[in-house]
UniProtKB/Swiss-Prot annotation:
Kelch repeat positions: 30-78, 139-190, 192-241
Main location: cytoplasm
Lineage of the species this protein comes from: Eukaryota, Amoebozoa, Evosea, Eumycetozoa, Dictyostelia
One Gene Ontology MF term: zinc ion binding
Region (Disordered): 354-558
Alphabetical list of PANTHER family matching this protein: ACYL-COA-BINDING DOMAIN-CONTAINING PROTEIN 5, FIBRONECTIN TYPE-III DOMAIN-CONTAINING PROTEIN
UniProt entry keywords in alphabetical sequence: Coiled coil, Cytoplasm, Kelch repeat, Metal-binding, Repeat, Zinc, Zinc-finger
Zn-finger region bounds: RING-type: 897-932
Protein name in the entry: RING finger protein B
Highest taxon, organism lineage: Eukaryota
Recorded coiled-coil stretches: 593-653, 743-845, 872-896
Length: 943
């Protein structure tokens, strides 16, 4: 099976939507759409006319239901009035918010072209949406659905009596299907309700069940072939009595679908799946929550949503076999009623196409659907929005034929031309009839009567809808005008054609024609009338022609109405006449109206797009602001984290209690301290050098000799000149010494600032060194004292009495100098102590005194050290891997012990895991012969 897809060019299409319902009208002229959802929910009624591919909004009387989607709609006609033109469309449930509706609304469509809303007041039940419904024996049968307000899915069957307006729950048996919503339902043989697919909030389904509406027993269907994917929101349409079409939906992987599957119902329990292939390039987009309607051999797919797109397009599907011949012929529905074609009973239509036993009685394709009638018409040029029945077209053809016959008869009677034979077909209608006398003397009166009746018929038809509106809607603008009765023939005067269409009816005087008109009119069909043959010059010829007409009428009575219409059109050559008389002004006006409508529609669409763009830009700006705030928050959080980490490191660095810390952190802290001390030492070397230079500049104590409780400088006596020079030098030294303390103080202040940055350990080391130096100096002084004592005791005898006075005076001076020096030293020691006390205040207990840059340097050095350690470890691992690979390569082909080279290796050494030794050799070894590591354990291998 193949499917030919075409996209329909629409006129005045409604807003795109999904979740709506589409109800096929019983006369096959189109379908009605109610409700749906897009940016908002709808409650309007839209009518689509298949004859001119146009949409029109229906204004109904009464209180309309509230906006909704996900509801159900069912066509119902009372069994008490099976031949009535009125019917009802019953709507139940649906939702506009999370809470679904539970009301029932009925749209009454009467034969007088009126639409009336009525809300049925019943006991409240739980509302639901996404359910399905059918009508069986004056009961509305509802199955499934969901209630988002209560987070509940249903698998119960509810019955609503259309007579008593009461709800009740039907108890069912058999294999009951699981609870679900957005499934599909269809009826077979009017007593079986099938369901397919659906969704229960967690799982998608592709199973089939049917409920016997007489026994209320569920049964699961096992179909052959490859079933469709699990889905919901699809559509199911009966295209024949034994064929079901599944289209679209949303799959289990949240992907929208546009595939088609056909379920063949071949018997009571025989079912088979088939997936046809697409033809053409206008394949419908993937969608769900759309509608499909089967009318006149075609399936109409309308609206839906999918992949973020809201759709309002319309596609038609035609079914072909492998030889590209139609499986379901395109039929023409001809309603007999004179009322609006939206109204019509399914029993009051005649199929004028190829007979199809499997086609639905409500199917219809319109005159434009037949390939042999008005093949040059284009659906995009249909501007009329009123639906048209083909009975008016047939009556227009009949009246034009009868008018032509009367005019030809009058001309032949006046000219007495017996050789002119007109093979015209006489048609009759149920409005008016005329009798022609058989005498030639009354020809003029008959002609006058015919003209009068034609004018009366014209006035009568003008009050009705234009019967030739289908022809006027086509691109060829076919129209007929029969007002000018003085013209010789419609065929000979194409210039008399205009956009005004009228019809007249005549008939010859015969008793059989009157009876046939009455009988056929009562049945509501289009009778077949025999053609008129012969001359109208005398009574005998008229009698012969009447007898021939009666015989031909009996022979052609079985012909279909479509063949008669086609023969009449061919005999009139109406295509050529209409093509010669195109009214360009009307065409231009219609084209202008069409373009104006399209421009208005595009402007509205553009405005809606601009509004959407504005909203989108506003949302984008809001999102950008939110993203910026989130980024700022993330930056703040990251900074807080870094600050907390630095605090932790700081607390670890300056924490005195390190007993609770792990060994790794202690090692890291030790490395950090060592590196910081090294850096500080490098920075403080100039200050230590300055201290050493100052200590060198301080004069050392002169070596003295204690003798008889007096101190004597170990110097040789100098001559007087030398003494004077020495005194001058001493005075200069004293001046320098007086200046030195000031310089020392200044230098000490500088050193205090510099030494304030030294660490505690370094200062302790300096103090220790100073103490050691002092001890060494004291030891040296004591040694010198001892040596001087010995020297003085040995040389005391040599000293003379003259020099004693000199030495005493000199000793006093030196003692005074020593006292002064000692006082200066004590002052210096006090200053050093004060300096040490100040240093103790500025000692580096931790790294508090370090600035930000020094901390960053320490941290970078720490990270660099970690990187170096990691690189060293990686290098070791790589070296180890290389060595292991080499060992593997060496031992790859080795099948014997490394030591004895005779036994196979069956021991694995641990921890090196070398397996190149046998058990005998391994028992004698303590180290691995390959890697020289100690053997801690051995594992034997059993082969």
């Amino acid at each position: 099976m193949k499917i030919d897809c075409k996209r329909v060019s629409l006129i005045g299409s409604p807003e795109p939507r999904w979740g709506h319902t589409g109800t096929t009208l019983p006369n096959g002229s189109g379908f009605i759409v109610f409700g749906g959802n897009s940016n908002r929910a709808f409650n309007d009624i839209q009518y689509y006319n298949i004859f001119n591919n146009s949409w029109s909004k229906i204004e109904a009387v009464g209180n309309a239901p509230s906006e909704r989607y996900g509801h159900s709609a069912v066509l119902y006609q009372s069994q008490s009035r099976p031949y009535s033109d009125s019917y009802q469309i019953i709507f139940f449930g649906g939702r506009a918010t999370s809470k679904p509706f539970s009301d029932i609304n009925i749209l009454y469509v009467n034969s007088n072209r009126s639409f009336i809303w009525k809300q049925v007041t019943t006991k409240s039940i739980e509302g639901r949406a996404g359910h399905t419904a059918v009508v069986y024996r004056q009961n509305l049968v509802v199955f499934g659905g969901h209630n988002n307000h209560k987070s509940k899915y249903y698998n119960s069957v509810l019955l609503f009596s259309l007579e008593s307006n009461e709800w009740r729950q039907q108890v069912c048996g058999g294999v009951i299907p699981s609870a679900r919503a957005t499934h599909s339902t269809f009826q077979v043989n009017n007593n079986k309700m099938f369901i397919f697919g659906g969704y229960d909030g967690k799982k998608y389904y592709n199973d089939i069940y049917y409920l016997d509406l007489e026994t209320w027993i569920w049964k699961k269907v096992e179909a052959k072939g490859t079933p469709p994917k699990p889905r919901s929101g699809h559509s199911a349409t009966m295209i024949q009595n034994n064929k079901l079409m599944i289209f679209g939906g949303c799959g289990s992987d949240s992907n929208f679908l546009n595939d088609i599957h056909i379920l063949h119902i071949e018997g009571a329990n025989e079912y088979r799946w088939e997936q046809p292939s697409y033809l053409g390039l206008e394949i419908p987009q993937a969608r769900f929550r759309h509608t499909t309607n089967f009318i006149g051999g075609r399936v109409y797919i309308y609206a839906g949503t999918g992949s973020g797109n809201l759709m309002g397009d319309l596609h038609t599907l035609e079914f072909l076999d492998d030889n590209n011949t139609p499986l379901i012929p395109i039929t023409i529905s001809i309603p007999i009623t004179n009322s609006n074609s939206i109204v019509g009973s399914p029993n009051t239509s005649i199929s004028c196409g190829v007979s199809n036993s499997g086609a639905s009685s409500s199917s219809g394709g319109g005159i434009s659907g037949h390939p042999s009638i008005l093949s040059s018409s284009s659906s995009s040029s249909y501007l009329s929005t009123s639906p048209l029945s083909t009975s008016s077209l047939a009556s227009s053809y009949q009246s034009s034929q009868s008018l032509q016959f009367n005019q030809n008869q009058n001309q032949n009677n006046n000219n007495n031309n017996n050789n002119n034979n007109n093979n015209n077909i006489q048609t009759t209608t149920t409005t008016t009839t005329n009798n022609n006398n058989n005498n030639n003397n009354n020809n003029n009166n008959n002609n006058n009567n015919n003209n009068v009746e034609s004018n009366q018929q014209q006035q009568q038809i003008q009050h009705q809808t234009s019967p030739m509106s289908v022809l006027s809607r086509s691109n060829s603008n076919i129209s007929l005008n029969s007002l000018n009765s003085s013209s010789s023939s419609i065929l000979s005067t194409p210039s008399t054609l205009s956009t005004t269409t009228t019809t007249t009816t005549t008939s010859h005087a015969s008793h059989t024609s009157h009876t046939s008109n009455r009988s056929n009119g009562s049945r509501g069909g289009i009778p077949s009338i025999p053609p008129f043959n012969g001359r109208s010059s005398n009574h005998n010829n008229n009698n012969n022609s009447n007898s021939n007409n009666y015989n031909n009428h009996q022979q052609t009575k079985t012909n279909s109405a479509e063949e008669l219409i086609l023969e009449e059109l061919k005999s009139l050559n109406i295509y050529d006449q209409a093509a010669c008389n195109k009214d360009f002004q009307t065409n231009l006006k219609r084209v202008e109206e069409l373009f104006n409508q399209k421009i208005k529609h595009e402007q509205k669409y553009r405005q809606s797009l601009e509004e959407k763009l504005g909203k989108a830009n506003h949302q984008v700006s809001l999102l950008t602001n939110q993203i910026q705030s989130i980024i700022q928050k993330d930056e703040l959080t990251s900074l807080k984290k870094e600050y907390s980490e630095l605090k932790k490191k700081h607390s670890l660095l300056y924490s005195e209690d390190i007993d609770d810390l792990p060994t790794e952190t202690c090692l890291k802290l030790e490395e950090i301290h060592v590196k910081s001390l090294e850096k500080l030492r490098v920075k403080k070397l100039p200050s230590s050098n300055q201290l050493s230079t100052l200590q060198q500049q301080i004069p050392q104590q002169p070596t003295t000799i204690i003798c008889n409780n007096s101190q004597i400088i170990q110097q040789q006596p100098l001559p007087p000149l030398q003494q004077q020079q020495q005194q001058q030098q001493q005075q200069q030294q004293q001046q320098q010494q007086q200046q030195q303390p000031l310089e020392i103080q200044e230098q000490l202040t500088m050193l205090q600032l510099q030494l304030s940055q030294l660490s505690q350990q370094q200062q302790n080391q300096i103090d220790k060194q100073q103490k050691q130096e002092k001890l060494q100096q004291e030891q040296q002084q004591q040694q010198l004292k001892n040596i001087n004592r010995l020297s003085i005791s040995s040389n005391s005898s040599t000293l003379s009495s003259k020099d004693s006075f000199y030495f005493e005076s000199k000793i006093q001076e030196l003692s005074n100098q020593l006292k002064e020096k000692q006082q200066a030293i004590t002052d210096r020691d006090n200053k050093i102590k004060d300096f040490e006390n100040q240093l103790n205040k500025y000692k580096l207990i931790g790294l508090d005194s370090l600035d930000h840059y020094q901390l960053l340097e320490l941290e970078s050095s720490f990270h660099n050290g970690l990187k170096q350690i990691g690189s060293i470890k990686d290098q070791r691992y790589l070296n180890r891997l290389v060595s292991l690979e080499k060992e593997k390569d060496q031992l790859k082909d080795q099948n014997s012990c490394v030591i004895c080279a005779s036994n196979p290796p069956n021991i694995v050494l641990l921890p090196c895991r070398h397996s190149s030794l046998c058990s005998d050799c391994c028992s004698k070894l303590t180290k691995c012969p390959i890697c020289r590591s100690h053997i801690e354990n051995k594992i034997s291998i059993y082969q």
